[in-house]
């Protein structure tokens, strides 16, 4: 077994990372190894200067600073693993400065734009339209990550009764780091999912038993709709709803969910829990977003001459 395979196996066993995180590590490592091979370098004998050259190479290929930093972090972790396994004694990434980047505020849709998108989707009564309507309603009602949305299982749908005896739908979601959280969804999302469940069988491929367990089954290898396919369908729906598809993505719906909750007075800690953020500082970016919107609103004040 090669060093990379050993490292990925360790990540899977000890850090409980998601499949997507493991794939990201794998891509970064193979890209790095391809660079080393191209420049006739050995991973066990490279210098810090070699690493700086590699970073310059990444930047020259128009890779954003955030992406470069992620790759550096991957390689640094990889060398820490190699040292722990006595394959090398030196981490060439240790004294490398990370490229600086601006922490951009997330893009969001207005409530009016969200309503326009949802109204358009609810008018399509084809099986594909009913499914997409359910997925978009659920995404905006929950703030799920797209990877969490598409991989939901039927068993993740739970029901529970309120103190008034009302039955409501909740979802048990396994997020990053295998951390479980519970999501309660609104009535519109419940209705759209109930409608979808009546036609879900259209998408079940009985020849592939694996897809039977998923809420949004498909013929894809994983057994459920891919993130990429959902993103394409979402952009198409946005176009027909009169919105610019360039500014629509599953992640923007997640940002919109969080921002609109904060705007409505929700506590930041509650939003952190709903989004599945491990650190409150990740959630705090939405407070900066709200401040930004307030500044723009004040600029429109009639007595503001600037």
UniProtKB/Swiss-Prot annotation:
The keyword Cell cycle applies. One of its GO terms (cellular component) is cytoplasm. Residues 104-299 form the Tyr recombinase domain. It is found in: Cytoplasm. Gene3D superfamilies: 1.10.150.130, Intergrase catalytic core (1.10.443.10). One of its GO terms (molecular function) is tyrosine-based site-specific recombinase activity. It comes from the Bacteria. Keywords: Cell cycle, Cell division, Chromosome partition, Cytoplasm, DNA integration, DNA recombination, DNA-binding. GO terms for biological process: cell division; chromosome segregation; DNA transposition. NCBIfam families: PRK00283.1. Belongs to the 'phage' integrase family. XerD subfamily. Site-specific tyrosine recombinase, which acts by catalyzing the cutting and rejoining of the recombining DNA molecules. The XerC-XerD complex is essential to convert dimers of the bacterial chromosome into monomers to permit their segregation at cell division. It also contributes to the segregational stability of plasmids. Forms a cyclic heterotetrameric complex composed of two molecules of XerC and two molecules of XerD. This is Tyrosine recombinase XerD. It comes from Rickettsia conorii (strain ATCC VR-613 / Malish 7). The gene is xerD.
């Amino acid at each position: 077994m090669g060093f990379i395979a050993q490292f990925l196996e360790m990540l899977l066993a000890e850090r409980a990372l998601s499949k997507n995180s493991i794939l990201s590590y794998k891509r970064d490592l193979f890209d790095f190894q391809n660079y080393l091979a191209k420049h006739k370098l050995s991973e066990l004998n490279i210098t810090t200067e070699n690493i700086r050259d590699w970073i310059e190479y990444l930047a020259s290929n128009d890779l954003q600073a955030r992406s470069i930093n992620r790759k550096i972090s991957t390689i640094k972790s990889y060398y820490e693993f190699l040292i722990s396994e006595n394959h090398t004694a030196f981490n060439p990434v240790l004294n490398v400065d990370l490229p600086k980047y601006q922490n951009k505020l997330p893009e969001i849709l207005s409530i009016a734009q969200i309503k326009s998108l949802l109204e358009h989707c609810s008018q399509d009564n084809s099986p594909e339209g009913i499914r997409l309507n359910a997925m978009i309603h659920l995404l905006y009602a929950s703030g799920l990550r797209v990877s969490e949305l598409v991989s939901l299982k039927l068993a993740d749908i739970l029901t529970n009764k309120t103190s008034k005896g009302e039955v409501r739908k909740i979802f048990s979601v396994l997020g990053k780091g295998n951390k479980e959280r519970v999501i309660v969804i609104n009535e519109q999302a419940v209705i759209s999912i109930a409608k979808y469940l009546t036609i879900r069988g259209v998408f079940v491929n009985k020849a592939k038993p694996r897809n039977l367990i998923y809420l949004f089954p498909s013929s894809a290898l994983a057994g459920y709709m891919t993130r990429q396919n959902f993103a394409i369908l979402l952009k198409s729906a946005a176009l027909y709803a009169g919105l610019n598809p360039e500014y629509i993505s599953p992640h923007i719906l997640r940002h919109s969910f969080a921002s609109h909750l904060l705007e409505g007075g929700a506590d930041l800690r509650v939003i952190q829990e709903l989004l599945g953020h491990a650190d409150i500082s990740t959630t705090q970016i939405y407070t900066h977003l709200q401040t930004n919107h307030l500044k723009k609103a004040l600029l429109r004040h009639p007595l503001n001459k600037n």
